[in-house]
């Protein structure tokens, strides 16, 4: 047998395998073993390559372990606590597994000897042939005195393998750090084991409640590249692709997902196989019945439904045209429209089609053409029909706001039609920018950021206020003076209960799978001033494949980025941003009004009755969102006019299905200081 050992960059490996993608700068090097495939070679030796997968490390640099005192809640005599920091990845600490077996949670506590600024923890699992003790569910706590630990600074579930795991978090001053190992990967035993444990340090940062704060980090077992909220339970479902850390080589017929339950803070993992659908780079929309419809992607023709009643995934008929990176949107009658998507399924002009959740069938609309809305991307059609900004509107119409400079109305009756709705003034194409309907009653849409091409071009600061009326009318476009404070591409936006729009992440130059020029300072668009103001920066880059969603408690989940296999920009985590409206002038969390009872369903044009505690002065409905690749066509906000008095209030729902798209919405009430309640879930029916 001929045998050759080489050191190749991850990018070279991808070229060798013929994978068409771009990896991050600074991708790590792997030892690649290439072996002969002669017939006389044993099958066990016919391996193309093996390499470890990296994740994004915490902010800063490794902290010296000099002066540390490490204690473990339990140890096996042959695997003492001292092996955690012996500098030898071939040895490991292990919880007691003989005699009286120690039960989880198992804890490892580090006394640094002095107060330091800590930004994260690195845990290297044992790397021998046994998976015993690989840690899954975990928490990381910090303390200044070793007695008061408070809530975790990071928590979640790590994927079960022997690659190095990180728990990244905002800088914290601490003398003590504790890792709690709650469950073992696979759930087979009660053990915990660690080969090496390290901490990261950086310069201290101050969180300012006047511009919002960043909370604990949620660790997922997958890179959360797509997400939605299950309205009846409040659980957040995220997924990556057929692998937890990579999308390439897809079309495997299954997807790795993870679920965060905010009620328990438990993060679980699940592989979806029954739908035979790799759901990376899909269209995502909630239909009028509240089911999530996920289309295309790596398995480009497939359709999968998430049923909130049973928390299960169901197969639906294939689309008429295979698609990937297409957009989809819910129509005024609850059906789903999709268009474009030449990233997968072939490069050709892909007109619209409609999914009917009642008839359970797709109908092609050959005259709902995509050609008029193509961008002038330097990569051609492969990119120019991606991630279209579309909004369901009156009488089954769809408004296309971008990313092309040209805007359009799409009609979905008969064989469909696409007509001009004007242009975003003189602004260039804005691929991978954002568009958010922050006031559906007034037809107000904010568009911001993006670039003239999908990648390898500078991002812009361009921002516009778009106003739409009746289908077929030319849209009114106002250029927002000054634009964004930071140029952005691959960012995400979430509309808030008060009508402002929160923008997070992105980068100044479009380079997928790189964190270069990452925008760590978020911004807030305020309609009252028609301007953007910066918010409190965070420490974890959120660039390509990142997500953001408004949560029912009026905070924003921001996470993900990467999904590039052998790279150092895989972000297996998310953070919670708490906007300033949840704080009082004293810097403490404000007392919130609450919705104490009332309707949970309402028909379009009907009256929504509810009771509250505290005095409220305003209310709004925000449709539950879904997000991938900076596109969230589900979210929109409807301000409400309040009726009633005292604690018994009501609001008449607009009698317009173009405004009140059927499906699940979040009802928020706000007091005179603008402090919002936790939302009440409302099902709006046609």
Q: How does the language model describe each region?
A:
Residues 1-24:
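Fungal secretory targeting signals
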Residues 23-61, 74-152, 161-205:
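Aromatic, loop-rich ligand-recognition surfaces of beta-strand-rich domains
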Residues 35-37, 54, 71-73, 111-113, ...:
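A structural detector for beta-sheet-dominated domains
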Residues 52-89, 389, 436, 462, ...:
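Predominantly extracellular/luminal regions of secreted and cell-surface proteins
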Residues 156-158:
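Chitinase-like catalytic core of GlcNAc-active glycosidases
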Residues 203-686:
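Kelch-like beta-propeller repeat domains
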């Amino acid at each position: 047998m001929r045998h050759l050992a080489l050191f190749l960059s991850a990018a070279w490996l991808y070229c060798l395998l013929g994978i068409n993608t771009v990896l991050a700068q600074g991708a790590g090097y792997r030892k690649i073993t290439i072996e002969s495939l002669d017939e006389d070679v044993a099958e066990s030796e016919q391996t193309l390559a093996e390499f470890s997968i990296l994740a994004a490390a915490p902010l800063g640099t490794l902290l010296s372990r000099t002066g540390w005192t490490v204690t473990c809640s339990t140890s096996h005599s042959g695997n003492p606590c001292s092996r955690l920091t012996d500098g030898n990845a071939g040895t490991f600490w292990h919880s007691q597994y003989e005699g009286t077996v120690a039960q989880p949670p198992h804890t490892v506590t580090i006394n640094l000897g002095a107060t330091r600024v800590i930004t994260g923890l690195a845990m290297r699992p044992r790397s021998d042939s046994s998976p015993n003790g690989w840690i899954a569910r975990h928490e990381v706590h910090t303390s200044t005195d070793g007695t008061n630990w408070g809530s975790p600074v990071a928590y979640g579930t790590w994927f079960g393998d022997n690659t190095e795991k990180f728990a990244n978090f905002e800088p914290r001053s601490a003398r003590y750090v504790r890792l709690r190992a709650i469950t073992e990967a696979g759930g087979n035993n009660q053990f915990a084991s660690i080969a090496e444990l390290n901490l990261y340090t950086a310069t201290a940062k101050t969180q300012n409640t006047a511009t919002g704060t960043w909370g604990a980090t949620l660790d997922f077992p997958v890179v959360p590249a797509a997400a939605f909220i299950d309205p009846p339970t409040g659980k957040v479902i995220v997924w990556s692709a057929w692998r937890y850390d990579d999308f390439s080589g897809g079309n495997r017929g299954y997807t790795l997902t993870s679920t965060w339950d905010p009620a328990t803070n438990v993060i679980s993992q699940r592989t979806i196989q029954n739908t035979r659908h790799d759901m990376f780079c899909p269209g995502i929309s909630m239909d009028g019945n509240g089911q999530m419809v996920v289309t295309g992607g790596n398995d480009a023709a497939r359709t999968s439904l998430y049923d909130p009643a049973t928390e299960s995934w169901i197969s639906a008929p294939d689309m008429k045209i295979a698609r990937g990176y297409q957009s989809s949107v819910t129509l005024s009658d609850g059906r789903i429209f999709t268009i474009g998507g030449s990233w997968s399924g072939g490069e050709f002009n892909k007109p619209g089609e409609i999914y009917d959740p009642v008839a359970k069938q797709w109908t092609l609309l050959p005259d709902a053409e995509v050609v008029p809305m193509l961008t002038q991307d330097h990569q051609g059609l492969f990119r120019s029909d991606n991630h279209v900004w579309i909004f369901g509107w009156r009488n089954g119409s769809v408004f296309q706001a971008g990313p092309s400079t040209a805007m359009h109305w799409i009609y979905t009756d008969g064989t469909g039609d696409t007509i001009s709705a004007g242009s975003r003034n003189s602004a260039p194409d804005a691929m991978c920018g954002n568009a958010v309907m922050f006031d559906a009653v007034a037809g107000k849409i904010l568009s911001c950021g993006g670039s003239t091409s999908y990648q390898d071009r500078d991002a812009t600061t361009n921002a516009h206020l778009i106003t739409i009326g009746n289908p077929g009318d030319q849209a009114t476009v106002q250029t927002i003076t000054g634009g964004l404070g930071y140029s952005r591409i691959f960012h995400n936006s979430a509309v808030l209960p008060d009508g402002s729009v929160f923008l997070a992440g992105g980068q100044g130059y479009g380079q997928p799978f790189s964190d270069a020029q990452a925008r760590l300072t978020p911004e807030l668009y305020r309609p009252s001033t028609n301007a953007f103001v910066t918010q409190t920066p965070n420490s974890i880059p959120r660039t390509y494949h990142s997500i953001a969603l408004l949560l029912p408690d009026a905070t924003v989940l921001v996470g993900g980025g990467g999904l590039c296999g052998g790279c150092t920009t895989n972000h297996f985590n998310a953070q919670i941003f708490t906007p300033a409206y949840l704080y009082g002038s004293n810097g403490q969390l404000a007392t919130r009004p609450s919705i104490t009872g009332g309707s949970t369903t309402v028909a379009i044009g009907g009256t929504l009755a509810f009771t509250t505690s505290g005095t409220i002065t305003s209310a709004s409905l925000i449709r539950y969102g879904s997000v991938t690749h900076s596109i969230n066509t589900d979210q929109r906000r409807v301000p409400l006019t309040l009726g009633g008095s005292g604690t018994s209030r009501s609001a008449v729902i607009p009698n317009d299905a173009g405004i009140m798209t059927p499906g699940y919405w979040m009802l928020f009430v706000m007091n005179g200081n603008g402090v919002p309640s936790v939302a009440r879930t409302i099902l709006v029916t046609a």
